[in-house]
């Protein structure tokens, strides 16, 4: 009997907390920041590609 009351209380708290939203979608901001960091890394690799190729060619000429 006590276990069912505790389970019901926990479930009621979960439902109450899940239905309340204080700010518009605050949990997605963390994922957007991670996505932005990944995008910046990808763009940096794309921009550095030609420079790395030139360094590789220069190293090949030096041998």
Swiss-Prot record:
Keywords: Amidation, Antibiotic, Antimicrobial, Immunity, Innate immunity, Secreted, Signal. Residues 1-22 form the signal peptide. Its main location: secreted. Pfam families: Cecropin (PF00272). GO terms for cellular component: extracellular region. It comes from the Eukaryota. It is found in: Secreted. The keyword Signal applies. The keyword Signal applies. One of its GO terms (biological process) is antibacterial humoral response. PROSITE patterns: CECROPIN (PS00268). Residues 23-26 form a propeptide. Belongs to the cecropin family. Has antibacterial activity. This is Hyphancin-3F. It comes from Hyphantria cunea. The lineage of its organism: Eukaryota, Metazoa, Ecdysozoa, Arthropoda, Hexapoda.
């Amino acid at each position: 009997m006590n276990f069912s009351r505790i389970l019901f209380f926990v479930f009621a708290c979960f439902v109450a907390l899940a239905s309340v939203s204080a700010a518009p979608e605050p949990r997605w901001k963390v994922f957007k920041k991670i996505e932005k960091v990944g995008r910046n890394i990808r763009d940096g690799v794309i921009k550095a590609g030609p420079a790395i190729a030139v360094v590789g060619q220069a190293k090949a000429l030096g041998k």
